Regions:
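Carbohydrate-interacting regions of secretory-pathway proteins
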Residues: 15-220
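Positively charged n-region of N-terminal signal peptides that target proteins for export
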Residues: 1-4
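Hydrophobic h-region of N-terminal signal peptides that target proteins for export
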Residues: 6-17
Length: 220
């Protein structure tokens, strides 16, 4: 009888689902950077006259500041090349950028701005010292308040790409440029989000090294 009981226990253990890697999604190598419950590894940048930062309804709320509010990632060190970061963002108040991502290009910082300069400009700041409003990435994406948008940035040796929903809005060769950020968002390095006189919500923040991505995704 004892042999039977032990056999049943071993069989049950064998058919249990394997544990998921800590902090990682079950699919495609993505790792969650926000649990939807607390700021966790995200901290307020404490800009002068910045707005309130808190967690509400599963999102990080980056309140409207005078002029800016921001958060910065203070968790375990992440790769600075051959990676992608994705998030969802919504502007609930204001008409300027609401979830601008500062991210590293190897050792240099850069910012992906969506709906900056009064809502009219989307692009990377800065390339060869030029802002998103005056460089090769300058474009316009119409943003509506109270609507969620999916955003993503990917960096490799040969490309920097960025998407808003399914539209690729940035594609450049990083070897052709030097990268920097405006001094106002320096506190968002290496990874951080900022808003300008606007309130933004950010959720579903995910990161993956392209080394962990399935082959079908590495060229997307």
């Amino acid at each position: 009888m004892r042999f039977v009981v032990v056999s049943v226990i071993l069989l049950a253990a064998a058919v249990e689902d394997p544990p998921k890697p800590k902090g990682a999604d079950a699919k495609d190598g993505w790792k969650s950077l926000f649990d939807g419950k607390s700021l966790g590894d995200w901290k307020s940048t404490e800009f002068v006259h910045g707005g309130k930062v808190d967690v509400a309804d599963g999102s990080i709320r980056i309140g409207g500041g005078e002029p800016m509010t921001g958060i910065v990632y203070k968790g375990p060190k992440l790769p600075t090349n051959d990676y992608e970061i994705a998030w969802e963002a919504k502007r609930t108040d204001g008409r300027d950028f609401f979830a601008a991502l500062t991210f590293p290009v190897k050792e240099s910082p850069c910012t992906f701005v969506v709906a900056g300069w009064g809502g009219n400009v989307t692009g990377l700041s800065s390339l060869n010292g030029a802002d998103a409003s005056e460089n090769a990435t300058t474009t316009s994406v119409k943003i509506e308040n109270d609507r969620w948008y999916k955003m993503r940035v990917r960096t490799t040796e040969k490309k920097i790409e960025a998407w808003v929903d399914d539209e690729k809005v940035v594609e450049i060769d990083p070897t052709e440029y030097s990268f920097s950020v405006r001094i106002e968002v320096d506190r968002c390095r290496p990874f951080g989000f900022a808003s300008y006189r606007s309130t933004g919500l950010v959720r579903n923040i995910r990161f993956r090294s392209l080394a962990d991505a399935p082959a079908k995704d590495k060229g997307k």
